[in-house]
Amino acid sequence: MPSSVRRLLIASAKGGVGKSTTAVGIAAEMARMGKKTLLCDLDMTSRSLDMLTGEEDRALFGFSDVIHGKPLDDAVITDVCGIRGLNLLPSTVTESDADFDERLKNTVRDIVSRDDYDFVVVDTGGGISVAEKIAPFFDSVIVTSEQSQTSLRAAEFAGAELQNSGGRNIRLVVCAFDLPSVKREKRAGIVEMIDRSSLKCVGVVPLDKKLQKLQDSGKIPERTESALAYKNIARRLEGYDVPLFYGMRGMRKKLSSAL
């Protein structure tokens, strides 16, 4: 595979922990950084990325069509949400058969091997059954989690299983981090979360009250705290040294209580 193309797999051992939000957030920030980015929706149960980006009306084809031979360029939505360089391959209903796993792997391998994108981000479903099959094709894997003990335990499990399946550079992203709850409810702080998961943390995304409203209207956040967090994560993935909560004045002031 061409070394110039960066390939990132997003996974989680359970649903509802910010996986698809993270996939969209990182892909959008990579495109805003000037990188031609392909975002692929392999969550064949939720199939939510076209909705999160407001592109339902343009999602005429998807991953299952590419599996069955449709050219990728004919299935991809370009300039998603008005962001130049952000492209989306939606998920569509896929019928499993005896050869599905092999065709899935071959199709993903072909997609991430293309040299016409700078960055490829692949979102998978809650649970790691699909992620395990395709993990070896990626440079890096992100596992998402929230603050709860069950979510952190699931992240640790997912990270270990994906590493056993050939995943490399496996990192943790903590989503919907509720700073007041660290003291009020004695929930896990950042250091405790990292210790519990045994994964290197590449970013913490604060709880963003604006996020749900933006997603419901099919808009990708920009200039919100969650968008700033994903911008920081994208820059770290590119090798930049970015402090935790950089650019988030309120979070930086309260950083000591979050650790």
Where are these regions (language model features)?
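Walker A/P-loop NTP-binding active-site region of P-loop NTPases
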Residues: R7-P71, F119
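P-loop/Walker-type NTP enzyme "switch/lid" segment
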Residues: L42-D115, D216
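Conserved catalytic-core segment of NTP-binding enzymes
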Residues: S113-D115, F119, T124-L207, Q212-K213
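Short amphipathic alpha-helical segment that frequently serves as the phosphate-/nucleotide-binding helix
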Residues: S20-G25, L152, R187, A227
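Short, well-ordered alpha-helices that flank and scaffold nucleotide-derived cofactor binding pockets
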Residues: V24, A28-R32, P136, A160, ...
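Short, hinge-like loop/turn segments at secondary-structure boundaries
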Residues: E55-A59, E161-L162, A188-E192, K219-R223
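C-terminal boundary of histidine-terminating zinc-finger modules
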Residues: L214-A234
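Acidic-aromatic/histidine active-site loop/patch
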Residues: M1-R7, I170, A234, Y240-L259
